[in-house]
Amino acid sequence: MRPALSRRFFLGRSLVAAGLVSSTRQVSAAAATDDDQVALEHRLDEVLATPVLRVDSLDKPVVIASMELLRNGRNFVVRVRTSDGAEGIGVPNAMHLVHTYPIFLNRVAPFFVGKDARQLEPLLWELYRHNDNYKYQGLALWVCVAAAEFAILDLLGKLSGRSIGDLLGGAKRRQIAVYRASGNRGNTPEVEVAYLKQLVTDSGARALKFRLGGRMSKNADSLPGRTEKLIALVRETFGKEMTLYADANSSYDVAEAIKIGRLMEEYEYAFYEEPCRFDHFEDTKAVADQLSIPVAGGEQEFSDYGFRWMIKNRGVDIVQPDLHYHGGFIRSLRVARMAHAAGLLCTPHMSGSGLGFLDAAIFAACLDNPVPFTEFKGDTDIPVSSATSSLKCENGMITLPTGPGFGITIDPTFISKAVPVTSF
């Protein structure tokens, strides 16, 4: 059984190699004392209290006059307008908003009408408190909040002439290296490898992620023996030059998760996502403490303080806020900055739907502590273009758009044909 330090040392070496922390910090992390832990807690609280949004260039109130939810086919669009006629557009997670839209219409959108959009960041807390909205905390509330935040950020960007990345502290990079992810489970290892080959052919990606286990399955595999065979076969097929990640989607208890993790270590995988039940923080930590492979998690977490626990206690090595499930860019960047303060990495979880691939790229561009590759799913049916980016994965990279707001144009005909969604 490997001591917990082995994982810290493994992660520390990776961080040092990436230039994200110094070797001195690595050594000090290994020899952490109670005083160090108290100091870390203070740093995390300081990060949570530090503003993310930068709107200093807007010296007059930006009063929101309306916030609409529009639907075109299976896609939604949020349109926010000011009393002066300025407009911002956001594309929410339609996969979930189709079920939760009454919360958006009845609780989220009305709250923002009449408010100064420049105060978006403190308003997120006021919205949480307003009308007992905190009782709805979870995906149902935060997907709706993210939908509103995206549109307001686009509005603020267009009014200030700044990109969303600039509003959030500045993009550190325009070229984002991506990994392609398979959502398959239950097919044979041979069929899955053929699918992964096609993803690489289509994108030029130098990193891949696929699924293990059976999803919340109490150790059951989707097919008998699939996981073990697939872990080996993918590495043997793509060789050591391909970076490999794998996602268990809460499939295992601690013992089984460690067993699978050991196999992933043998085949030199780069991270192991959500090995145990996502809400069993202690189980995930117990697994991570026994493995050298970095453990990633946080996709389902909707609380800043849930992430604070993970980071403070080293429950994971890589935090994965979902930009929709966690309520938008601002809240997710707080998580990333807490992780950075603790010497951990961050990568956005991409829940698919809408323009999630673009959201993930913008977020990754703003990180001081990204993993080398960011998830890309560019299979949108929304007609969108950019003058500064193809919005496609080319040679394993996506180029971040420049320009105000999201830096994109959604076909005006698509917007004009979208039907307002009203409360019932």
What are these regions (language model features)?
Residues 115, 122, 136, 262, ...:
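Shared catalytic-loop signature of beta/alpha-barrel
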Residues 174-290:
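Metal-dependent enolase-superfamily TIM-barrel catalytic cores that perform enediolate-based chemistry
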Residues 85, 148, 161, 208, ...:
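Conserved, mostly hydrophobic/aromatic
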Residues 24-71, 87:
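C-terminal segment of N-terminal export signals and the immediately downstream linker at the start
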Residues 149-185:
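Glycine-rich, aromatic-flanked loop segments that form ligand/cofactor-binding clefts
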Residues 1-18:
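N-terminal secretory signal peptides and thylakoid transit peptides that target proteins
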Residues 14-17, 384-424:
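C-terminal extensions of enzymes
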Residues 42, 87-159:
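Metal- or metallocofactor-binding catalytic centers and their adjacent structured scaffolds
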